[in-house]
């Protein structure tokens, strides 16, 4: 469960290391975001020479969350960290590589490029 001021690790090679959520997209009263939801964030920590710099405003999709997510078969999935992948306005990833596993829920939310780039889909 991600909300405003939540910090997330970036799971791609855009050059950002950590982002801070400043808005959950999907309505003015929407407070929380889970796996597969899109947020607006600011880059808090970045590697030198990357595509994004610290202070940039970016859109990101959540690929891993500590809060468990219930699946239709009754099972739950949760991860050890909160992580996101930076995306462009057309919902395509900005980076060319994805690090770490991603949740299967991204396939249902039409983020097929992220699913295909990920090394493991849980």
Swiss-Prot record:
Coiled-coil segments on the chain, per record: none
* Cellular component aspect of the GO annotation: cytosolic large ribosomal subunit
**Xref: InterPro entries:** Ribosomal_uL14 (IPR000218), Ribosomal_uL14_bac-type (IPR005745), Ribosomal_uL14_CS (IPR019972), Ribosomal_uL14_sf (IPR036853)
Q: Which GO terms describe its biological process?
A: translation
**A GO term, aspect molecular function:** structural constituent of ribosome
Q: Show the SUPFAM superfamilies listed in the entry.
A: Ribosomal protein L14
Q: Which UniProt keywords apply?
A: Ribonucleoprotein, Ribosomal protein, RNA-binding, rRNA-binding
Q: What Pfam families does UniProt report for this protein, alphabetically?
A: Ribosomal_L14
Q: Which PROSITE patterns does the record match to this protein?
A: RIBOSOMAL_L14
Family to which the UniProt record says this protein belongs: Belongs to the universal ribosomal protein uL14 family.
This molecule's function is given as: Binds to 23S rRNA. Forms part of two intersubunit bridges in the 70S ribosome.
Subunit architecture: Part of the 50S ribosomal subunit. Forms a cluster with proteins L3 and L19. In the 70S ribosome, L14 and L19 interact and together make contacts with the 16S rRNA in bridges B5 and B8.
NCBIfam families registered for this protein in UniProt: rplN_bact (TIGR01067)
Matching HAMAP family = Ribosomal_uL14
Name used for this protein in its record: Large ribosomal subunit protein uL14
Q: Which organism is it from?
A: Corynebacterium kroppenstedtii (strain DSM 44385 / JCM 11950 / CIP 105744 / CCUG 35717)
The root-end lineage is: Bacteria, Bacillati, Actinomycetota, Actinomycetes, Mycobacteriales
């Amino acid at each position: 469960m991600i909300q405003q001021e939540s910090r997330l690790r970036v799971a791609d090679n855009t050059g950002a290391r950590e982002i801070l959520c400043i808005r959950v997209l999907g309505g003015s009263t929407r407070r929380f975001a889970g796996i597969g939801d899109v947020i607006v964030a600011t880059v808090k920590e970045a590697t030198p020479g990357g595509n994004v710099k610290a202070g940039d405003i970016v859109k990101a999709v959540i690929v891993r969350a500590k809060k468990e997510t219930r699946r239709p078969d009754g099972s739950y999935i949760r991860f050890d960290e909160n992580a996101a992948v930076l995306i462009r306005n057309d919902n395509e990833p900005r980076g060319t590589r994805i690090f770490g596993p991603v949740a299967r829920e991204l396939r249902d939310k039409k983020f097929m490029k992220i699913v295909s780039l990920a090394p493991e889909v849980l």
